[in-house]
C-alpha cells in the first residue's frame, strides 16, 4: 500500500541491531512532498536523523531527552529548553512525557503546554508512551487543536498506566475532563 495525502505515518520503537539507524529517515524521505504528517517515537540516532525532515511530532520521554543531551532532566521546567533544541533541529511539535511529573508539549506555534498527571493508581506503565501518541493523534484529528490533542495524549497515556491492559475510551474521557479542569 502506498501512503497518500490524508494518511499519517507513525515511526515508533527501538530498532534491532541489524537495521540501520537511519531507517526512519529513509522512510520519511519516501513520503516527502506528499503532505503526510510523520510522528516519530524513537531514541538516539534513529530520532535525531529524522529531525532535518521536520517530523510533525516527536515524543521522547524525559529519560530519552536526558540521554540525547547528556544531562539529567526531571522537571517540566528543565525539559522545555531541551525540547526547544529539538525544534531548532527540525521537529515541529515536541511532546515529552515525564512519568509522574506530567508532560510538556512545545507546539509549532511556540506555545508551551504543561500538564500534571491526573489522579489514579499506577498499575502498568508499559505502553503508556504509545498510548500518549495515540491519544494525541486522536485529539488532533478530532479538533486540529494542540491543547485538545495534548490533553487527550496525557489522558490516554495515563489511562493506559492506570490499567492492566488497554484503557477504554470512557476512562480516557474521564481523565481528559480531570486534566481540562486543572
Question: What are these model-derived regions, one by one?
Answer:
Residues 8-78:
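Conserved beta-alpha-beta core of the PfkB/ribokinase-like small-molecule kinase fold
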Residues 29-30, 48, 76-182:
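Conserved phosphate-binding/catalytic region of the ribokinase-like
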Residues 7-8, 93:
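Structural motif
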Residues 1-4:
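Conserved phosphate-binding/catalytic loop of the ribokinase/pfkB sugar-kinase fold
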